[in-house]
Amino acid sequence: MAEIEQSMIDEMKDGFPLFDNKGDGKIDGAQLGDVLRSFGLNPSNAEVEKIAKANEGKRLSFDDYLAIHKQVLGQGEVGSYEDFFEGLKLFDKEGTGLISGAELRHVLATLGEKLTEAQVDELMAGGGGQEDAEGNVNYDTFAKYLMLG
C-alpha cells in the first residue's frame, strides 16, 4: 500500500468532516469519488464505480477512507509523455507528426477512459489540440499539452 506523508493525512483529517452530512464522523460510500478527488487523487470513473459499489450503503470512518485512499494512490500513475506520444503516433499513418483532428476527437470520446463531448472540446480548444488549416493536430504538441495537466 502507498505511504502518505503525515502532513497530508492531517490535512485530509481536517477536511474529512466537510463531507460528513450526518454529523457522525463518517461519509457515505457514494461520496468516495468526490472525496478522493478533493484530496488530490484522480481515479478513473471505472475505479470510482468499483469502489462505490463495494461500499454502497456503508458509512465510512476516516480510517476506512484512508485505507481506500492508499489503495487508489498505489494503483498507478498518470501516463508519461512518451506513453501519450507513442499512443497517438499509432494514428499517424503517414509519419508526418500529425493526426486528423476528427480522429483524435473520436479516440478521446470512445477509447479508454471515455471523455464527454464537452471534455473533448475543452481539450481540443486548449493549446495542444488546435487543428491546422487542414484539420490536423500535431500530436507531439498535444501530448506535451496533456502532461501540463
Swiss-Prot record:
Family annotation (PROSITE patterns): EF_HAND_2 (PS50222)
Protein's recorded name: Myosin, essential light chain
PANTHER family associated with the record: MYOSIN LIGHT CHAIN 1, 3, MYOSIN LIGHT CHAIN 3
GO (cellular component) term, any one: myosin II complex
Record has Repeat as a keyword: yes
Keywords: Motor protein, Myosin, Repeat
Record-annotated EF-hand domain positions: 7-42, 79-114
UniProt xrefs under InterPro entries: CALM/Myosin/TropC-like, EF-hand-dom_pair, EF_hand_dom
Native species: Branchiostoma floridae
Entries under Gene3D superfamilies matching the protein: EF-hand
Classification of source organism: Eukaryota, Metazoa, Chordata, Cephalochordata, Leptocardii
GO molecular function, one term: calcium ion binding
Subunit structure: Myosin is a hexamer of 2 heavy chains and 4 light chains (two regulatory light chains and two essential light chains).
Keyword check for Isomerase: no
